Structure formats: structure tokens, C-alpha cells
Amino acid sequence: MKKWTNRLMTIAGVVLILVAAYLFAKPHIDNYLHDKDKDEKIEQYDKNVKEQASKDKKQQAKPQIPKDKSKVAGYIEIPDADIKEPVYPGPATPEQLNRGVSFAEENESLDDQNISIAGHTFIDRPNYQFTNLKAAKKGSMVYFKVGNETRKYKMTSIRDVKPTDVGVLDEQKGKDKQLTLITCDDYNEKTGVWEKRKIFVATEVK
């Protein structure tokens, strides 16, 4: 009996060690898989754009947001925050955000004065979507690649708003074009709720 008890304790100990190792490694594995997936999608996007341009050298098609929600519409790069993410069509539903960073609204246009893009923030995954956006500051550069265009922006405003404050999505007539980047902020460990939204506004550099 004692022999079996010792064996069971040994097995239980091994299982606990394996579970602990898995829990420790999981965020790193998830980050690796996410980075690999997004890099492949960005590479494929650039390849598709280049192929399309070579087919139609005389007339460069104006970049458009795909109607297919699973297609990449472009990608955003923020060097100061070590962010480079493919951007998907809106709206930023849970399903779309599972694919990746996406336009906040369904009717978003690349010609809008205020282009809004939303992305997740995860506590234990620093490389995931907009988690590290907090490393950006006023003056940080933002690059938005759509088709053959690389649009340049500079961070001009960073602030918190309530989740219900949808005014950040509004067009602002008479003002320079801008990107509005949206992610979660102020995580409440007791309720498991992100109580605020962090808003990063980047104004186009002409």
C-alpha cells in the first residue's frame, strides 16, 4: 500500500510540475505564434500589393478596405512601441479583434479625416496587438501602409476616456487627417473589467 501511495505522490508531483511549466511557457508560446502569424500576413500583403502593381503599371489602383472581413487591409507600425500589426476591416467586434487589430467602424474609409483603429491589450502578452502601445509618447511616429502608400503620422495626444465615449470616432472637419488608436486601460483585478479606454491620436505628417 505504501509503495502505491509513493507512486501516486510521485505522479502527482510530476503532473504539477508539468502544469506549472505549461502555465509559465504558455504566454511565451502565444507571443511566438502571434508574431509568426502577423509577420507572415504582412509579408503576404506586401507581396500581393507588389504583384498587383506589376500587373497594372499604367494605372495604380486607389487602396480600398476589403469587403471580406478576413482580408488584411494594410498594416500599422509604431517603432517606439515595437508594434507592427496587420489591420483588418471593421467593425471592431470580438470576432474581428480575434483576427487582429481592426478598424473601429464598419463604414471606415481610407479617405476619412479621422481613421479609427482598435486593438486588444493583454496583461501577460506584451507583444500582442496594442498591449505595448503605452510605450508610445507624444512625438512618436506612426506608419500606416495601405496599398503602395506609406502614410506618416506623429503622436499628438494621449488620454483616457470612458468606454461609452464614442465621440473619439467622429470626423473633425477642418482639421488635419489623423489616426485614432484605441485600446483598453485601467484593469480592475477585482471585477476583471477594463474600466477605461486609452486613446492615442496621431496627426498626419505632410
UniProtKB/Swiss-Prot annotation:
Changing R197H: Does not affect substrate cleavage specificity. Severe decrease in sortase transpeptidase activity. Residues 1-6 are cytoplasmic. Keywords: Cell membrane, Hydrolase, Membrane, Metal-binding, Protease, Thiol protease, Transmembrane, Transmembrane helix. It is a single-pass type II membrane protein. Could be used as a target for the development of antivirulence chemotherapeutics against Gram-positive bacterial pathogens. Signal peptide: none annotated. Residues 25-206 are extracellular. The record marks R197 as: Transition state stabilizer. It is found in: Cell membrane. It comes from the Bacteria. Belongs to the bacterial sortase family. Class A subfamily. Monomer and homodimer; in equilibrium. This is Sortase A. It comes from Staphylococcus aureus (strain NCTC 8325 / PS 47). The gene is srtA.
